């Protein structure tokens, strides 16, 4: 988490690492002789964990979610053997690759899992809990107010139709 409460630098760093992992495996994953099932296993076993390392602490904004999903679709299109010029929709590419959820929603799932499993067990006086539950206090700035980690938890729970109080029970 950055000093300003954001996670953009972390997300960009993880996406660079994902791209480096992709470049290392590109010749294998573009091989037409290898089946989709084997390619998916490599993708799920190497690239997804590389991209989502430490995603539990991310409070992603929509711009960062878009970056994550764009890079994921670039990898999936290459994995399936479809270019942008083929004009195949993202949903069809996901169906061909047998991948149900976006990478950004997987990051949200990790945030919620950490919130539900680990966060509730941490003593309220420990520094980790105090930092993550803290409100980002800044003077009035132009634009949208800063979002903290707890705000991203609320957004992720809202996408599932839940509230923080309901999730704690």
Residue ranges and their predicted role:
Residues 1-169:
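Short linear motifs embedded in intrinsically disordered, charge-biased segments
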